[in-house]
C-alpha cells in the first residue's frame, strides 16, 4: 500500500487539532487523553537535545507515513516510509510550513556505525526500510543540514479508524461511475457510488486515493482529500460526546508514534503553538527524474535544495546556507550531469491551508518536471562518462535482499 502525501497531511492535521482541542474537556477526558497519548511516545535520541517546546521556540517535525501493506509484515511499523514531510512550526511568526520530500530522491543513507546500510546511496524512502525511523530521521537531517527536533509516524489504518470514530462523513461522488481502487489495489474492495452518501472509514480511504479514473488525475485526488480533511476536522471541532472523543484518541494512539511528549506540563506549552497551526503553507522538494541501473530516481538541483534549506532554516531561526557552503548528502543533479542549471525553475509556490481545513492553490504548486525530463540517462550507470565520472566512483548499490532502491 502506498500512502499519499496529502493523506499524511490529513492525519497529522487531525492529530494536531486533537492536541489543541484538549483544553476544552473536563478532567476525566483530559486524564484519559494523557494516557492515550502516552502510548504513542518513543524517543530515538536523534533530536537537538533542546526542549524547544518547553521554551516555546520554533521547532521542526519529520512526518512519516508508513507503508504497511504486506501481509507478511509482523509489525504495524514495518515497511517503507512512502511519504515524508518536514514541518516547521514558529510561534513568533505564527507560521507553519510543510515541505514534502520526494520519496525517490537519491541520497546517502545516514545511520549508526552498527548499521551496515549506513553510507550507501539509495532512495530517500529506503532509509526507513534499512534502519527504521531512526535512520530516516538521520538521513533527512543530513540531507537538509538541520537537526530535527520531533518526529511523527503514522500508518494508514489511522485514517480508517478516525473517520469511523467521528461517525462517518458525507461526500458527493460527481462521477457517473463508482469510485474504486480495487483494480490497482485489490485489498481495498470498498467503493463510493455516484451521488451523495455518508461513507465510513474504508470508503473514505478509497475516496481519497483514487486518481487513475479521474480526468484531473492527482489534482482531482488532492481535491477529494482536502474535502475529507475539512469534514473530519469539522466533526472533531464540533464534538459534544466524550465517548466519541475517546474513540478518536484511541485511533490516534494505536496508529501513531512520536517523541512529542504529551503531559500535564507540556499541553499548556503546546497550546501556545495553536495560532501557528491555523495557517499552513506547503512546498515540495522534488528532483529531476533519471534512471540508474534500471531504477528510477530523483536528482535534486543545488538551486532547489538551497531554496528548500533556507526556507526551513529561516523558519527555525538558523543561519542560512549559501551556494558556496551548501551541505547535503543528496546526490545533486550537477554532480551527475554538470552544466548550467539556471534554466531549471520548477514551480515552487506555496499552497495555503486555513484553520477550517480549506485549501487554495493549484496542482502546479507541487512542482513540475523540466526539460531535463525523466530517463535522461541511458539506464545503466556503466554508460555514464565525461561529466558523469563523479558518479561512477561514488555510487554504491545497496546490499542485495534489502529492497532498497526499488
Swiss-Prot record:
Biased composition (Low complexity): 347-397
Principal subcellular localization: other
Family: Belongs to the LytR/CpsA/Psr (LCP) family.
Keyword Signal: yes
Residue ranges of the region described as Disordered: 347-406
GO cellular component annotations of the record: cell envelope
Species lineage: Bacteria, Bacillati, Bacillota, Bacilli, Lactobacillales
Parts of the chain that traverse the membrane: none
InterPro entries per the UniProt record, alphabetical: LytR/CpsA/Psr_CW_biosynth, LytR_CpsA_psr
Classification via Pfam families: LytR_cpsA_psr
Function summary: Involved in biofilm formation, cell division, autolysis and the regulation of acid and oxidative stress tolerance. May be associated with systemic virulence in blood.
Protein name as it appears in the record: Biofilm regulatory protein A
Additional notes on this entry: As a result of luxS inactivation, brpA expression was decreased by 70% in early-exponential-phase cells. Also, brpA expression was down-regulated in response to the deficiency of smu486 and smu487.
Keywords annotated in UniProt: Signal, Virulence
Disruption phenotype: Cells form longer chains and sparse microcolonies, are more resistant to phagocytosis, show greater level of platelet aggregation, but are unable to form biofilm at least in vitro.
Amino acid at each position: 500500500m502506498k500512502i499519499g502525501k496529502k493523506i499524511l497531511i490529513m492525519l497529522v492535521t487531525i492529530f494536531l487539532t486533537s492536541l489543541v482541542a484538549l483544553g476544552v474537556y473536563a478532567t476525566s477526558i483530559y486524564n484519559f487523553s494523557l494516557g492515550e497519548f502516552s502510548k504513542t511516545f518513543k524517543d530515538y535520541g536523534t533530536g537537538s537535545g533542546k526542549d524547544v517546546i518547553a521554551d516555546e521556540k520554533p521547532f521542526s517535525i519529520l512526518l512519516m507515513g508508513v507503508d504497511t501493506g504486506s501481509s507478511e509484515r509482523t509489525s504495524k511499523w514495518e515497511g517503507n516510509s512512502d511519504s515524508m514531510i518536514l514541518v516547521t512550526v514558529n510561534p513568533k511568526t505564527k507560521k507553519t510550513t510543510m515541505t514534502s520530500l520526494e520519496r525517490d530522491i537519491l541520497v546517502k543513507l545516514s545511520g549508526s556505525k552498527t548499521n551496515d546500510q549506513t553510507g550507501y546511496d539509495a532512495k530517500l524512502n529506503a532509509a526507513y526500510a534499512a534502519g527504521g525511523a531512526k535512520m530516516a530521521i538521520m538521513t533527512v537531517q543530513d540531507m537538509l543540514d538541520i537537526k530535527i527536533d520531533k518526529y511523527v509516524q503514522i500508518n494508514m489504518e489511522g485514517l480508517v479508524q478516525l473517520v469511523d470514530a467521528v461517525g462517518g462523513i458525507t461526500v458527493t461522488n460527481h462521477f457517473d461511475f463508482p469510485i474504486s481502487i480495487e483494480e490497482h489495489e485489490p485489498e481495498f474492495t470498498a467503493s463510493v457510488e455516484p451521488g451523495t452518501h455518508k461513507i465510513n472509514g474504508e470508503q473514505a480511504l478509497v475516496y481519497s486515493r483514487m486518481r487513475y479514473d479521474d480526468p484531473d488525475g492527482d489534482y482531482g485526488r488532492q481535491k477529494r482529500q482536502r474535502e475529507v480533511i475539512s469534514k473530519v476536522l469539522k466533526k472533531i471541532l464540533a464534538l459534544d460526546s466524550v465517548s466519541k472523543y475517546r474513540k478518536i484518541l484511541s485511533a490516534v494512539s494505536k496508529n501513531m508514534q512520536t517523541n512529542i511528549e504529551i503531559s500535564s506540563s507540556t499541553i499548556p506549552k503546546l497550546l501556545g503553538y495553536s495560532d501557528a497551526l491555523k495557517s499552513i503553507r506547503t512546498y515540495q522538494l522534488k528532483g529531476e527524474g533519471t534512471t540508474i541501473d534500471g531504477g528510477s530516481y530523483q536528482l535534486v538541483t543545488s538551486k532547489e535544495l538551497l531554496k528548500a534549506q533556507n526556507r526551513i532554516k529561516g523558519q527555525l531561526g538558523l543561519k542560512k546556507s549559501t551556494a558556496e557552503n551548501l551541505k547535503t548528502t543528496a546526490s545533486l543533479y550537477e554532480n551527475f550531469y554538470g552544466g548550467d542549471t539556471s534554466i531549471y525553475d520548477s514551480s515552487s509556490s506555496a499552497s495555503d491551508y486555513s484553520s477550517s481545513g480549506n485549501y487554495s492553490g493549484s496542482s502546479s504548486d507541487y512542482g513540475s518536471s523540466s526539460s531535463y525530463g525523466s530517463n535522461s540517462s541511458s539506464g545503466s550507470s556503466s554508460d555514464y562518462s565525461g561529466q558523469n565520472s563523479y558518479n561512477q566512483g561514488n555510487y554504491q548499490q545497496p546490499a542485495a535482499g534489502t529492497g532498497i532502491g526499488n
